[in-house]
């Protein structure tokens, strides 16, 4: 009976820590945020509204302090937040008017060649990159699969106003201009909307063909690799090919979405940009992401990649604008690299719990047999 009392006391305090203290500490260190939202227009409306609310609170606090300087600064920040809220609203209202179904890929290619090739390449259609290093701050991306991994409305917003689409207006402004300029709109709304639809059609059409070619080559290479192995059964070969295919696809998406800034040294991947250039450009060196899945967890990364400002307010990391499929691929890649033994670890944990349960039964039985002789 005494042992049961001790057992229940241990269970009580363990449960208190596990379901009480630990979740509370987690909520303090990692405050809850709104869920992942791939409707970027709605997400921006919520974000800018939140920014205005923060600045209004700061203005109230400044008025309470009585400091004229603090009041002036707070009022200026509030007016800026309100102007950005209105400008962001107008941006997404413009994007909402675009009929992407009427885009012409060939005209989009012509527009790209006339406006974008100074910085960007599209190797899938034979357009080489003009800038191949990070001397301007970061290596400009090749846009061969931009139409596959980015949300089409986000891409259009990025073309029209990069700073607002990327949520980096706190970092880049007129005094510190962003590397990518806004697309030169004509002022004719109908023509501008058609041009944007054409550009997106070009990106999506190019990405579709590029992905097909990439998949076919990858599959052929894997089949050739395992065809030489006579020890494996056909079923085992098929399973391994599928596993490596998924990993390579996920890595490919990561490289295009994140690989210009971040290393993953556990997988031998090094960013295409020079870290010192990135530090000067962003204000800090982007972290290696090898173990980020273990330190932050998949749920945190889902929210952070979708909208970095939700987790680290004021961070220089831009919102990437990945669609849901591409974001899942990025997280799966990081999980495979940083937590490759997750399934085995979880399964081993169950076995250990069973082992200790059986051991406890034998320990109690042994204790009773020993003490029964003494009494």
Model-inferred region functions:
Residues 31-63, 69-112, 127, 208-254, ...:
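Electrostatic cytochrome c docking/interface patches
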Residues 29, 103, 109-139, 161-174, ...:
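Periplasmic/extracellular electron-transfer cofactor-ligation site
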Residues 106-110, 114-117, 141, 153, ...:
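Solvent-exposed, polar/charged alpha-helical surfaces in well-ordered, non-transmembrane soluble domains
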Residues 106-117, 244, 248-259, 269, ...:
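Sequence context surrounding c-type heme c attachment/ligation sites in exported
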Residues 2-26, 153-154, 181-214, 299-311, ...:
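C-terminal capping alpha-helices of c-type cytochrome domains
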Residues 2-10, 17-18, 23-36, 74, ...:
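Short sequence/structural segments immediately N-terminal
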């Amino acid at each position: 009976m005494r042992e049961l009392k001790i057992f229940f006391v241990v269970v009580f305090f363990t449960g208190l820590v596990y379901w009480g203290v630990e979740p509370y500490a987690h909520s303090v260190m990692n405050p809850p945020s709104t869920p992942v939202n791939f409707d970027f227009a709605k997400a921006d409306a919520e974000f800018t509204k939140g920014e205005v609310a923060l600045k209004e609170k700061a203005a109230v606090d400044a008025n309470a302090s009585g400091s004229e300087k603090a009041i002036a600064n707070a009022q200026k920040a509030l007016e800026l937040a309100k102007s950005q809220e209105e400008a962001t609203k107008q941006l997404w209202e413009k994007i909402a008017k675009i009929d992407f179904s009427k885009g012409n890929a060939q005209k989009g290619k012509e527009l790209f060649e006339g406006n974008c090739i100074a910085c960007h390449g599209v190797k899938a259609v034979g357009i080489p990159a003009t800038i191949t290093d990070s001397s301007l701050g970061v290596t400009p991306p090749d846009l061969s699969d931009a139409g596959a991994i980015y949300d089409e409305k986000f891409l259009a917003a990025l073309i029209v106003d990069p700073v607002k689409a990327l949520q980096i207006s706190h970092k880049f402004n007129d005094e510190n201009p962003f590397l990518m300029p806004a697309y030169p709109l004509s002022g004719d709304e109908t023509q501008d909307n058609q041009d944007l639809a054409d550009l997106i059609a070009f990106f999506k059409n190019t990405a579709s063909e590029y992905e097909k070619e990439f998949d076919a080559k990858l599959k052929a290479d894997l089949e050739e690799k395992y065809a030489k192995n006579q020890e494996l059964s056909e079923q085992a070969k098929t399973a391994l090919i599928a596993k490596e295919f998924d990993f390579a696809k996920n890595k490919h998406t990561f490289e295009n979405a994140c690989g210009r800034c971040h290393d993953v040294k556990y997988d031998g991947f090094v960013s295409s940009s020079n870290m010192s250039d990135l530090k000067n450009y962003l204000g800090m060196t982007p972290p290696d992401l090898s173990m980020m899945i273990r330190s932050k967890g998949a749920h945190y990364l889902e929210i952070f990649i979708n909208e970095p400002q939700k987790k680290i307010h004021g961070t220089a990391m831009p919102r990437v604008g990945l669609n849901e499929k591409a974001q899942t691929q990025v997280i799966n890649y990081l999980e495979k690299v940083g937590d490759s033994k997750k399934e085995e670890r979880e399964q081993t944990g169950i076995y250990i719990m069973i082992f200790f349960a059986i051991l406890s039964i034998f320990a109690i039985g042994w204790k009773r047999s020993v003490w029964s002789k003494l009494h």
